[in-house]
């Protein structure tokens, strides 16, 4: 599962933001999201990956038996910090992603290590109620070893299309990256990920979700197409902060390559904080 250092780091980040927000608003507690259009906007806003709020995600993929490692466990934690910015007259969304892997090994039990640090900057546009974004992506070789990352610098592009409806959200997030420099013995190749985003809202902040990430890696010859079906719950504080808890089992309808999971459990907590800029509806 997630390392204690990761949990401590995220709790510290959330506590710092909450402390600053509480001084402004008196520290009122979180409340259930109600019903109606306002509640729909709150639930959609909590699930929209480019909603212009400071966002901290603590997420985890639990893989009971990765392909090629029968009877062993793979586990990947993800720390994501996302910040909306306005520079050069453009609405942008910067996201930093740090994986913490607990990976099955051939030598015995699982090892834990940090993966490659990824940063991307999406420039966002609005068209007929749909948010469209695209921008550069770069990944630094911060991984502990080849079991956790490529050992090379990677660059590419990221893009998103997402649209809210009265019933929920529909969209897709795409990343494409290529290795270009670093450890000469490291893998050279390309990885493309496609993440369909489907959410269906109920009353009081409850919702259904499907957000499995499809992965295509040319070096490891990995192809993995999971379909997820999960549930989540959103709370809104009176100061505008959003808290989102969710769990989503995912089953791979197609898979090939080492470490490609047959099924996995994705779970997480997302915290969103207004940052003093005008909130645009997506």
Give residue spans per PLM region.
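Acidic, Pro/Ser/Gly/Ala-rich intrinsically disordered segments
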Residues: 2, 22-25
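Bacterial N-terminal signal peptides
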Residues: 4-15
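Sec/Tat signal peptide C-region and signal peptidase I cleavage site
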Residues: 16-22
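Transmembrane beta-barrel domains of Gram-negative outer membranes and organellar outer membranes
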Residues: 24-282
């Amino acid at each position: 599962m997630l390392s204690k250092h990761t949990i401590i780091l995220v709790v510290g980040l959330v506590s710092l933001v909450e402390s600053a927000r509480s001084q402004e608003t008196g520290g009122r507690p979180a409340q259930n999201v109600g019903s109606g259009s306002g509640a729909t906007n709150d639930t959609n806003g909590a699930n929209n990956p480019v909603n212009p709020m400071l966002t901290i995600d603590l997420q985890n993929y639990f893989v009971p038996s990765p392909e090629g490692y029968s009877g062993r466990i793979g586990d990947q934690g993800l720390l994501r910090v996302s910040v909306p910015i306005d520079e050069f007259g453009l609405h942008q969304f910067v996201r930093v992603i740090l994986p913490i892997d607990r990976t099955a090994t051939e030598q015995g039990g699982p090892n834990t290590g940090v993966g490659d640090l990824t940063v991307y900057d999406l420039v966002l546009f609005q068209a007929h109620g749909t948010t469209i974004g695209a921008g550069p992506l770069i990944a630094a070789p911060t991984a502990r070893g080849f079991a956790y990352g490529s050992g090379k610098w990677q660059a590419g592009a990221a893009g998103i299309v997402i649209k809210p409806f009265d019933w929920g959200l529909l969209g897709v997030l795409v990343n494409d990256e290529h290795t270009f420099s670093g450890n000469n013995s490291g893998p050279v190749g390309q990885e493309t990920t496609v993440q369909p985003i489907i959410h269906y809202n109920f009353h009081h902040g409850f919702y259904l979700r499907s957000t499995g990430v499809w992965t295509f890696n040319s070096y490891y010859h990995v192809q993995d197409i999971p379909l997820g079906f999960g549930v989540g719950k959103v709370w809104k504080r009176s100061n505008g902060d959003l808290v989102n808890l969710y769990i989503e089992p995912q089953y791979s309808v197609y898979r090939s390559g080492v470490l490609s999971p047959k099924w996995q459990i994705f779970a997480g907590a997302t915290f969103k904080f207004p940052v003093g800029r005008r909130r645009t509806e997506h």
